[in-house]
Curated annotation (Swiss-Prot):
The protein's name: Phenylalanine--tRNA ligase beta subunit
Subcellular location: Cytoplasm
Domain annotation tRNA-binding: ranges: 39-153
Any one GO molecular function term: magnesium ion binding
GO CC field: phenylalanine-tRNA ligase complex
Catalytic activity: tRNA(Phe) + L-phenylalanine + ATP = L-phenylalanyl-tRNA(Phe) + AMP + diphosphate + H(+)
PANTHER family attached to this UniProt entry: PHENYLALANINE--TRNA LIGASE BETA SUBUNIT (PTHR10947:SF0), PHENYLALANYL-TRNA SYNTHETASE BETA CHAIN AND LEUCINE-RICH REPEAT-CONTAINING PROTEIN 47 (PTHR10947)
Quaternary structure and partners: Tetramer of two alpha and two beta subunits.
Organism: Streptococcus pyogenes serotype M18 (strain MGAS8232)
SUPFAM superfamilies attached to this UniProt entry: Anticodon-binding domain of PheRS, Class II aaRS and biotin synthetases, Nucleic acid-binding proteins, PheT/TilS domain, Putative DNA-binding domain
Top-level EC class as recorded in UniProt: ligase
Top-level taxon of origin: Bacteria
Keywords: Aminoacyl-tRNA synthetase, ATP-binding, Cytoplasm, Ligase, Magnesium, Metal-binding, Nucleotide-binding, Protein biosynthesis, RNA-binding, tRNA-binding
Pfam families according to UniProt: B3_4, B5, FDX-ACB, tRNA_bind, tRNA_synthFbeta
Amino acid sequence: MLVSYKWLKELVDIDVTPAALAEKMSTTGIEVEGIEVPAEGLSKLVVGHVLSCEDVPETHLHLCQVDTGDETPRQIVCGAPNVKAGIKVIVAVPGARIADNYKIKKGKIRGMESLGMICSLQELGLSDSIIPKEFSDGIQILPEEAVPGDAIFKYLDLDDHIIELSITPNRADALSMRGVAHEVAAIYGKSVSFPQKNLQESDKATSEAIEVAIASDKVLTYASRVVENVKVKPSPQWLQNLLMNAGIRPINNVVDVTNYVLLYFGQPMHAFDYDKFEDHKIVARAARQGESLVTLDGEKRDLTTEDLVITVADKPVALAGVMGGQATEIDGNSQTVVLEAAVFDGKSIRKTSGRLNLRSESSSRFEKGVNYATVLEALDFAAAMLQELAEGQVLSGHVQAGQLPTEPVEVSTSLDYVNVRLGTELTFADIQRIFDQLGFGLTGDETRFTVAVPRRRWDISIPADLVEEIARIYGYDKLPTTLPEAGGTAAELTPTQALRRKVRGLAEGLGLTEIISYALTTPEKAIEFAVAPSHLTELMWPMSVERSALRQNMVSGMLDTVAYNVARKQSNLALYEIGKIFEQEVNPKEDLPNEVNHFAFAICGLVAQKDFQTQAQAVDFYHAKGILDTLFANLNLKVQYVPTKDLANMHPGRTALILLDEQVIGFVGQVHPGTAKAYSIPETYVAELDMAALEAALPSDQTFAEITKFPAMTRDIALLLDREVSHQAIVTAIESAGVKRLTSIKLFDVYEGATIQAGKKSMAYSLTFQNPNDNLTDEEVAKYMEKITKSLTEQVGAEVR
């Protein structure tokens, strides 16, 4: 919200600087983003009166003699198409500073001396989007009353201070000058002064010219007035200045009046050309599937049943609350104007403007809410302005469909309730004074009082809201600092928090870097790497399809991060994330999904760089598995790795499921080359674990085992096996022999070659045995080896080499 300091001072009698006002507002609940002075950086810009204007042959230039208040006219060469004799213009004299700190100097153009520059508003730093179209390609023409030689700032209100407010959704009342005036008046203990318009109505009734009806419960009220015999023309300079300072382009006096009322009351309005109506009945209803509308910006909008439209003769003429239609827009030939003031459902307007990517000053106010109590007042004010600025004749009365509650909302509380929550010792007189400043009614006493909250403050409905208002106006800086009286208790991590912290520490100790990716993704990516996909949980109204579904895996988000970094020449990556996935086993439209904590990581590129001693080493499956092995070892958990080809987006020969107590808790492996290509990433290895399953399996107590004094004994065994036999199957077979003294199984060689028959491979293991209480003998170890050999032969068909 852009607030004109000049305009604000007309509504509230304050004598503070804009900077002091901004600081005060920021400390009482409405944040000020900044203050801008349009004239800042500009100098030596004066009013000029063009005395003569001659075309320069064979050029687009004009040789002008301009009166700038000096003794003699100033010769200026100007290329603007709309320069002519008799007009008042903006002149930058030599030494002047215009936009971008550009300094104007005397010069020659086509051999002709030019003693200054006739300026457009763009050259003063104003945006093209707010400059009247009649001046967008040429110079600005000043009012007739401008005096040659005067500084131009007061004529264009460039010396105003524009205060930019950051309005939160709960304070939509401040999206109007009247709302801001009420706020400032409350802060400084002043009274507001709102100008009144004298509306003179003709004998003809509005109901004779127009009829309105509502055919949707999303239209709360719809009111109209009719103004005849209007003269459409440019608005007076003061109104154009006011709109431009608020970031709105002046169009003509009729449209500008509706925008003025929007800024003043916060009530969106629209003006229709009555003579372009095919019928005299306006109906506000939901759009029908297949209907379309060409809006004021010239775009054809395809409508859905979720949109609200204003119709005449059952044809849409406006997109309710968002933008009018081109077919009934006001133009230079318009003579009879229909003014609309309505209240539409904010959620419906938000959906429509979001779907069409068509946000306007009107839609933003309907989305946040408008003041029910001033809808008709704003309508009458607009009609009176058209009577004043467009010489229109206002038909008597208005037509309206749908009624709104306009009486104040009553909220009750007590003085004790207020003081307990603020830690203050306010008296009832203090409370009365504060609510008087706010313009709220107050009845009762300190035991129980009732506040009559005006409809303009629809954010206040419960006692806690009253406490907040009291604190704001009393001053947050005046609230006493109180310390809690209860004794403190030592904080303790929950098991989930403790596991999360431990896993994070282990991951970072292994060289992984934490990331945080979006929980929302595309429906396809949401289930891309899920071991057991469930029903999708999708947003009903997503901002974009890329963020429309809750993820059921974390790997897809990690790969997006990998792709982002690889595209920026960062190819050696080791990333991890701890976050939630969302599983939905029932109806996603009726039930909330289960939120499950998961741990995932992704590695790609080199694990070791090339140097003078070693060759570069790329990451592989065993690096990924090694990270998991370290994690499980530190958590004192024993898992199994089972090869799988069931995960479509993982490499079928380099992927394994991770089993804990015979339950799948995750997977590890290489991303399928096709998937990696789709993500534009190199060979990448990933893993994902169910943290909830890890937490459930953690041993409650860990018993310390004394370090044995007795030495271990090691035996190597080389096995000839079928090529399909996995390492995990061999480990399982060795462990199933039931040798209690076996403490370690390590694979140290795998061989396939000419000396091995086709379809076979050789795998060599180092087995370590140890008795914590005694020395092992060779005979004991030999028996252990016999049992292990027998188990290997029976279970995996191994031959000892």
